[in-house]
Structure formats: C-alpha cells, structure tokens
UniProtKB/Swiss-Prot annotation:
The keyword ATP-binding applies. Belongs to the cytidylate kinase family. Type 1 subfamily. Keywords: ATP-binding, Cytoplasm, Kinase, Nucleotide-binding, Transferase. The lineage of its organism: Bacteria, Bacillati, Bacillota, Bacilli, Lactobacillales. One of its GO terms (molecular function) is dCMP kinase activity. It comes from Pediococcus pentosaceus (strain ATCC 25745 / CCUG 21536 / LMG 10740 / 183-1w). It catalyses: CMP + ATP = CDP + ADP; dCMP + ATP = dCDP + ADP. InterPro entries: Cytidylate_kin (IPR003136), Cytidylate_kinase_dom (IPR011994), P-loop_NTPase (IPR027417). This is Cytidylate kinase. The gene is cmk. The keyword Mitochondrion does not apply. Its EC number is 2.7.4.25. One of its GO terms (cellular component) is cytosol. CDD domains: CMPK.
C-alpha cells in the first residue's frame, strides 16, 4: 500500500481501541498514538502534584512543563512522563476514574489536540480515542468507530486487571464503565462522537484478530477508492 493514511479509531471505554490500533499500526508499519494515554498522563501528574482536578488554570500551566513520550514495548507501548516510565501507573483506578474530568477541559484538549495533529500531519498513523475522527483528525482517510456491550467491556477490563494482579469486582467495573460512558458522551468539549463518515464495528462477539482483519479490510477498500 503506497498511500500513508491517517486512521482514526474511536469508541467508548474498553471497546478494544488501543489493543486493536496497536496491532493495525504494526501490520501497516504505521506510527501508533494512544491519545487516551496522553490524557491519563496529564491526570496522573495532576494527582501526583496535588492539583485540584477541576482547576483548569493550574492544570493548563502544568502542561507548559510536561513531557509525554511513547516507546515501543510488549505487550503494551511504554509511556513516559517527564522521563519516568508510567505505563502501569496511568492504568490504576484513581487515574481511570478521574481522567474524564481532565479530558473535559478545553485548555487541556487544545494543547493535546495540537500535539496529536502535529504527529499525524504526514499520515502513516493510527490514532485512537473518543473524538479522533470527529474533532482531532476530521479529514482522516479512514475512520472506525468500535462499539461493544457494557457487559463485554466490563469482562475485558476484569480480565486485564486479574492478569495484572489487581483485585477487582465485575459489577463495580460495569458501573464505572456506565458512568464513564455518560461523562464522555455528555461533556461539552469534544464529547464521545461517531463521525458521520465513520464505519461502525461491533466487537462484542469478535476476537481481537477478527477486529484487526476487519479494519485492515476497510483500509484496503479505502486504498482501492484512491
């Protein structure tokens, strides 16, 4: 495939975006950008510095002295905050349950969106998040919107937590996902939105490889249309 596309993959929490996006990027030899991890890093730093998560001014000022970096890793991409690896830290419950507050702030989204657009300007990138196709990369050649039932997403998160040695309650995870969905879809700034030209893929009964194959098929079809 000669064309280097911008591929936007959106969807709610635990729909499989990051897992699938990383594999698709590897298969296409594209760059992978986990935008959700960027918001988690900002959330983690605010928590570590004792900043009120609703204080948009202080968090915006904090971003002026914040460095976020990604490095290839297995089984997950490594994430660094100001030179320190925080790959596991940003997946802890305190960050997961607070990140929607940070992601709803206009100043934060403006800064991170500019970083993301700059990274994607030359194409050859797979970017996943909540509003990539609708707001961050509205001109992306390929837009995917992944969905899955709340039960399925809770079970996925449960298995991930158990694999990491984290004690977790399935019903609590379902409640947290429902709350996160509501926050993400109702926030005023860049809510979770399916772009009008995005292709919806229901991953509830699909394996990871099935989803990857479907996205690669969609990309191939986009290539044929060029």
């Amino acid at each position: 495939m000669n064309n280097k596309y911008q591929i936007a993959i959106d969807g709610p929490a635990s729909a499989g975006k990051s897992t699938v996006a990383k594999i698709v990027a590897k298969d296409l030899q594209y760059v992978y950008c986990d935008t959700g991890a960027m918001y988690r890093v900002v959330t983690l730093k605010a928590i570590q510095n004792g900043i009120d998560l609703n204080d948009e001014t202080k968090i915006s000022e904090m971003l002026n002295d914040t460095d976020i970096r990604f490095e290839p890793g297995e089984p997950v991409q490594k994430v660094f905050l100001d030179g320190n690896e925080v790959t596991e830290d940003i997946r802890q419950a305190n960050v997961t349950n607070s990140v929607s507050t940070i992601a709803a702030q206009k100043a934060v989204r403006e800064v991170l969106t500019n970083w993301q657009r700059d990274l994607a300007k030359n194409g050859g990138i797979v970017m996943d998040g909540r509003d990539i196709g609708s707001a961050v990369l509205p001109n992306a050649e390929v837009k995917i919107f992944l969905i899955a039932s709340v039960q399925e997403r809770a079970e996925r998160r449960y298995k991930e937590n158990i694999a990491k040695g984290m004690e977790t309650d399935l019903e609590q995870l379902k409640k947290e996902i429902e709350i996160r969905d509501h926050k993400d879809s109702t926030r005023k700034i860049s809510p979770l939105t399916k772009a009008s030209d995005a292709i919806e893929v229901d991953t509830t009964s699909m394996s990871i490889q099935d989803v990857v194959n479907e996205i690669l098929r969609i990309v191939e079809n986009a290539s044929k249309r060029k």
